[in-house]
Amino acid sequence: MGPGDLQDVLSGLKQQEHADLLVGLGRSDDAAVYRITDDVAIVSTVDFFPPIVDDPYLYGAIAAANSMSDVYAMGGQVLFALNVAGFPRDMPKDVIAAVFKGGADKVLEAGGVIAGGHTVVDAEPKYGLAVTGKVHPKRIFIKGGLRPGHRLFLSKPLGTGVVATAAKDDACEPAVLEGAVQSMLRLNRAAAEVARDAAVRGATDITGFGLLGHAAEMVDASGAGIALRLGDIPILPGALALAEKGTFSGGMKRNRTHLEHTLGARGRLSLGPSVGAAHAGLLFESETSGGLLFGVAPEDTRMVHDGFKRRGEACWEIGEVTAEIGIAIR
């Protein structure tokens, strides 16, 4: 569901107040957080979607990584997960088993366990997880935690959306698809660990609303602005070439329309002259199992770079937080 439609649907729902519900509907963050003790809070989230690759094992693993990402986006650690699935009646059992195996292996990699689940009959396959994690109540990452002067980091390249769209039409080179698959399989666990070490408070993960859509959520929640450097934003190999051919999903169009009617209508969305149609599309395009976007104080940037390097992971410093509300791409 696009961001505008989701806002309309949720507009009539009110936050149910509770002293221990630290993050709920009222904050519209990546996951719910409920305090258990002064030192432990539970992080809860759910996500599922139809297949984006042909291999059932990889589909299960990617869906699981995507589902667990919201726990990492809140600064949490994965504890356990429940399968959430729908499959056609005639789908071979070995295919379904492979989907579940892919999900279970990815949860195990995250340090968690599959504890159960629920399945229904559905015309189109769907799979994901309801994930439970934990976080210290005073160390929660939130979308509203950015402050002017913070440096912005992204932990994965953009481009999974255009690659997956091309793959559906058999219009994607195998090496390009493999690069996207490996990116989607990579957990945001290391990124969350580095961010915790750097005392991050403002973070989100880049998924269905795209980089600019999720950045806009942080702008609204933080009451600050975001300035991004186009040349520093990482893009998967082959993704820009696909974007130049106009290979975009319906999600990109919905995301762009929503932002142009919200931030854009208030003069708070600025795409500089260097941002061509292909790059703009990638910035608005939906991502699957995308990276963490987070802000750190300037004095902590070296800690972030060193932390990713020690873990053998890549990261990119792509911009900064400004006092002027809005998003600008230079």
Task: Map each language-model feature to its residues.
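Extreme N-terminal cap/leader segments of soluble proteins
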Residues: 1-54, 58, 74, 83-86, ...
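Acidic-glycine-rich active-site phosphate/pyrophosphate-binding loop
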Residues: 32-43, 185-191, 259-273
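Glycine-/charge-enriched secondary-structure boundary and capping motifs
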Residues: 89-113, 120-127, 197, 207-330
